[in-house]
Amino acid sequence: AGSGNNGGDEFAAARHLANLGMRLKIFFIGDVAHFSPATAANCETVKKMGIEIHELASDRTWDRLTVSLRFADVVVDGVLGTGFAGELRKPVLRLIELVNSMGKPVVSIDIPSGVAADTGAVSTVAMQAAVTLTFGLPKVGHFLCPGAALTGKLLVDDIGLPLQLLEEKSMRQVLLDDALATTLLPLRPLDVHKGSCGHVLVVA
């Protein structure tokens, strides 16, 4: 978990996972002073539930993380979110490289840590996710490499965005998926052949 809103989502996820009976540990990297009110509230709730939180601030804690990763079945990545841009700080870079080296399934919240949500760019390294759970709408960075190759299976959670916002003309991005492609392809008769479908000239 990081100290931004993505970390707040991580604390909230921990609460729900604990309620489902899962054993878990949270390793925190960042600065508590940067907590938003929502992140602070979720962190406090997790503490009251007795869930372990370890701050990655000493060699001993890093060693504990390494051991915990060896025995973990899955890693939930809530270090960096859609607001990330620029270069990774060295401790975060070290964390991402460590998690990737373990080969454990990673579930990233919103976008794999280290991927720029608007472009899919990666400055140095980024989390290799098996699954990415994003909210509201997919991000451009989920579909442009190298971000696309790091996203894994993409799940989009409906959080009730107003339909008016989704219909804004200022939203210029359109995702060509199977459903949209089906509407664009005309129905063809069973006896169709190459001479009855028109001609295409490609200039490249």
Regions found by a protein language model. Give the residues of each.
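YjeF_N-associated NAD(P)HX repair module
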Residues: 69-203
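A cross-family phosphate/adenosyl-ligand binding-site feature
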Residues: 1-74, 80, 87-90, 148
